[in-house]
């Protein structure tokens, strides 16, 4: 008997800390699990957390005077390419899945940081201190940028195809809010029954807490497998269809109650069952020795009326 037969598994948060605004850490204990289940649970959650949790990122930027990423803007220390790389690293927190736009309009001398970005109310910057650029003198930096939500990593060329904003510069987007996931499986010898437990470590970029990420990951696992749970009745129906088809194929041609002439012609052609008969088209029946058009029509009509089977006129 496994531990799961006696009591359900529980998740405990055994450590949680903020290493920096963009680096949150959580360590969790999942127990008890039956022997062999630990690696299944740990590996499944790890893959879901790393690859299936949504995040937000800048995907394209429009900067007046910048025709491409290699442009140089007067009075700005960074090249356009360096600015794009800095924008790529900015972490956003949002619950909206809609495409959103943000703006920046600032005059030097100043140091431009993420806190200077003008954003919709539905989205916020996780770390306002993230560096973007340095402006000297009376230099201006104006931009309009697009924020998308997604999963994983999106190359800049995909942003071009998806958005097609004229004169926009595409940005490689890092949507993944989870930096890293580790897990370890241990056997628990302290309980009455031998069980396993999983120790799961999660690092996030600050847009989501490790605990919330784990909750979302578990829900996604449930949503993934739940539809499969309801497939049993459909499978049962299909299995009955196979059974019905098998029974039809085993029916003897005698069941068609044909005339003696038609019946004898079929028998001489070694057609004994409906399965044998279905290997023929309507044209093939006419080629059977002494099998005239009237006999063929008789067989075709009997198949349709008694078994709801229609012979094709010719072979495909």
Swiss-Prot record:
Protein name, as recorded: DNA-directed RNA polymerase subunit alpha
One BP annotation, GO: DNA-templated transcription
Compartment(s): Plastid, Chloroplast
EC nos: 2.7.7.6
Role according to the record: DNA-dependent RNA polymerase catalyzes the transcription of DNA into RNA using the four ribonucleoside triphosphates as substrates.
HAMAP family in the cross-refs: RNApol_bact_RpoA
CDD domains documented for this protein: RNAP_alpha_NTD
Chain residue ranges for the region called Alpha N-terminal domain (alpha-NTD): 1-232
Taxon lineage: Eukaryota, Viridiplantae, Streptophyta, Mesostigmatophyceae, Mesostigmatales
Main location per the UniProt record: plastid
Top-level taxon of the source organism: Eukaryota
Gene Ontology MF annotations: DNA binding; DNA-directed RNA polymerase activity; protein dimerization activity
Subunit details: In plastids the minimal PEP RNA polymerase catalytic core is composed of four subunits: alpha, beta, beta', and beta''. When a (nuclear-encoded) sigma factor is associated with the core the holoenzyme is formed, which can initiate transcription.
Family: Belongs to the RNA polymerase alpha chain family.
Any one of the GO CC terms: mitochondrion
NCBIfam families: PRK05182.2-2, PRK05182.2-5, rpoA
Entry keywords, A to Z: Chloroplast, DNA-directed RNA polymerase, Nucleotidyltransferase, Plastid, Transcription, Transferase
Source organism (scientific name): Mesostigma viride (Green alga)
Record comment regarding domains: The N-terminal domain is essential for RNAP assembly and basal transcription, whereas the C-terminal domain is involved in interaction with transcriptional regulators and with upstream promoter elements.
Catalytic activities: RNA(n) + a ribonucleoside 5'-triphosphate = RNA(n+1) + diphosphate
Chain segments carrying region Alpha C-terminal domain (alpha-CTD): 247-316
């Amino acid at each position: 008997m496994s531990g799961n037969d006696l009591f359900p598994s529980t998740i405990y948060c055994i450590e949680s800390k903020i290493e920096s605004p963009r680096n949150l850490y959580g360590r969790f204990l999942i127990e008890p699990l039956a022997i062999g289940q630990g690696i299944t649970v740990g590996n499944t959650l790890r893959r879901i957390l790393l690859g299936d949790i949504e995040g937000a990122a800048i995907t394209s930027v429009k900067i007046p005077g910048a025709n491409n990423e290699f442009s140089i803007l007067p009075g700005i220390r960074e090249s356009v390419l360096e600015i794009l790389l800095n924008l790529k690293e900015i972490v956003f927190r949002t619950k909206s899945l809609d495409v959103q736009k943000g703006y920046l309009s600032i005059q030097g001398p100043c140091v431009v940081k993420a806190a200077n970005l003008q954003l919709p109310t539905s989205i916020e910057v996780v770390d306002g201190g993230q560096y973007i650029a340095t402006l000297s003198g009376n230099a201006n930096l104006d931009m309009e940028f697009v924020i998308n939500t997604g999963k994983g990593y999106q190359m800049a060329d995909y942003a071009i195809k998806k958005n097609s904003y004229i004169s926009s510069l595409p940005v490689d987007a890092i949507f993944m809010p989870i930096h890293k996931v580790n897990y370890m499986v241990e056997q628990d010898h302290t309980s009455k029954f031998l069980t396993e437990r999983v120790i799961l470590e999660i690092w996030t970029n600050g847009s989501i807490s490790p605990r919330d990420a784990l909750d979302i990951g578990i829900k996604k696992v449930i949503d993934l497998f739940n539809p499969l749970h309801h497939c049993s009745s459909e499978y049962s129906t299909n299995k009955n269809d196979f059974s019905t088809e098998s029974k039809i194929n085993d029916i003897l041609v005698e069941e068609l109650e044909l005339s003696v002439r038609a019946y004898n012609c079929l028998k001489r052609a070694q057609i004994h069952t409906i399965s044998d008969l279905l290997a023929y088209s309507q044209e093939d029946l006419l080629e059977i020795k002494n099998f005239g058009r009237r006999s063929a029509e008789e067989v075709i009509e009997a198949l349709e009326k008694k078994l709801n089977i229609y012979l094709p006129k010719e072979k495909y």
